[in-house]
């Protein structure tokens, strides 16, 4: 099989010919139809996140090993089954839950494998979906999507959709709330769709790209703010009668965006941090108790969340915005375009 692999950090991925795995026991071999291109893939390709004081937080320090086949938003067709697999048949169309844990830690024991102490996530800690086939360790990580869901729009549900869903749930939005969505890429757009459909909150979308904000408006944002062209703090305070936002979901999560977020939080507001751009933040410790802020880290979601999300997608409540499609040989181009902010919504590779 062919796979696009990270052999050297920040260098073009190499399309290599590898032996196609043979599934055993509970394993399932999936023929990849679509794999989403995610900012996490970019970080794994570059080999670092931005840490404190501008120092890089290396992916190898987090347990990532190279060479690696990236890609964790994977939809495809069951190709082969181990002898212990139950409930699945060859040629069934599936979405893979990639946030796999070792199964024994406290998080895994309550179904939160995405927060495992020793993660084995596909495309990050083990080979993922930038390939013609991917080996999944157990059939329990597969969810059937039937023939009514397109794999290009289904694949991003495994991360972009799941992460957005988890963030919206963590924001605990009420119908009269004002929520600011910071960053209107693939995740932000799905968060807007979800918040619009299931919360009734007033949605303020914030970005520095007018084109992305136009797409956000079409996907349900009530108000858009270009923070490069106007003062976002002044704009949001005016929109909220000088009270501030009830919740902020930051899909960028860089030092500059979070510093700005802190200036327009209402008392008792929830600040949900999702993005992985990183950096550091100085906090007024007095303001934390006196204004009773809640700062919440939100990382992907559970397989139960993904099943709920697929149901919402089937009902037309949400639909990932897929704007770019690539061949496997164009994997480096896809990552570069995403890094440079040239993909509106989600890019998908079709191996």
What are these regions (language model features)?
Residues 93, 147-230, 234, 238, ...:
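Mid-domain Rossmann-like dinucleotide-binding core that forms the NAD(H)/NADP(H) cofactor-binding site
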Residues 58-72, 100-182, 213:
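NAD(P)H dinucleotide-binding glycine-rich loop of Rossmann-like/cofactor-binding domains
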Residues 34, 97, 249-251, 351:
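Short, well-ordered coil/turn residues at beta-beta hairpins
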Residues 21-35, 50-106, 146-148, 152:
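Glycine-rich beta-strand-centered segment in the early N-terminal region that forms part
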Residues 171-175, 208, 214-294, 343:
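Glycine-rich cofactor phosphate-binding loops and adjacent beta1-alpha1 units
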Residues 91, 176, 221, 244-245, ...:
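Local beta-strand N-terminus motif with an aromatic residue
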Residues 2, 14, 31, 75-77, ...:
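Residues located in well-ordered beta-strands
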Residues 259-263, 267, 303-351:
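C-terminal hydrophobic helical "lid"/dimerization subdomain
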């Amino acid at each position: 099989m062919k796979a696009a692999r990270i052999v050297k950090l920040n260098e073009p991925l190499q399309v290599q010919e590898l032996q196609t795995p043979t599934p055993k026991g509970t394993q399932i071999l999936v023929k990849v139809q679509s794999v989403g291109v995610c900012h996490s893939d970019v970080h794994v390709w570059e080999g670092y996140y931005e840490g404190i004081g501008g120092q890089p937080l290396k992916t190898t320090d987090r347990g990532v090993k190279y060479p690696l086949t990236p890609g964790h938003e994977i939809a495809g067709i069951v190709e082969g089954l181990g002898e212990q697999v139950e409930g699945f048949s060859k040629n069934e169309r599936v979405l893979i839950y990639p946030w796999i844990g070792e199964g024994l830690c406290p998080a895994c024991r309550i179904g939160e494998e995405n927060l495992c102490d020793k993660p084995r996530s596909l495309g990050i800690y083990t080979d993922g979906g930038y390939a013609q086939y991917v080996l999944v360790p157990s059939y329990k990580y597969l969810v059937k999507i039937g023939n009514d869901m397109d794999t290009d729009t289904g694949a991003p549900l495994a991360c972009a959709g799941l992460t957005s869903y988890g963030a919206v749930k963590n924001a605990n939005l009420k119908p009269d709330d004002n929520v600011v969505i910071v960053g209107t890429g693939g995740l932000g757009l799905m968060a807007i769709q979800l918040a619009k459909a299931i919360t009734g909150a007033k949605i303020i979308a914030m970005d520095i790209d007018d084109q992305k904000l136009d797409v956000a408006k079409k996907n349900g944002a009530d108000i858009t703010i270009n923070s490069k062209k106007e003062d976002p703090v002044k704009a949001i305070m005016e929109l909220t009668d000088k009270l501030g936002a009830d919740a902020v979901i930051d899909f960028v999560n860089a030092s500059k965006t979070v510093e700005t977020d802190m200036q327009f939080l209402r008392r008792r507001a929830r600040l949900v941090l999702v993005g992985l751009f990183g950096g550091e933040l100085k906090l007024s410790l007095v303001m934390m108790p006196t204004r009773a802020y809640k700062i919440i880290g939100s990382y992907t979601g559970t397989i139960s969340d993904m099943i709920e999300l697929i149901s919402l997608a089937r009902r037309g409540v949400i639909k990932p915005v897929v704007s770019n499609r690539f061949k496997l040989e164009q994997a480096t181009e896809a990552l570069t375009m995403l890094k440079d902010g040239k993909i509106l919504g989600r890019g998908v590779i079709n191996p």
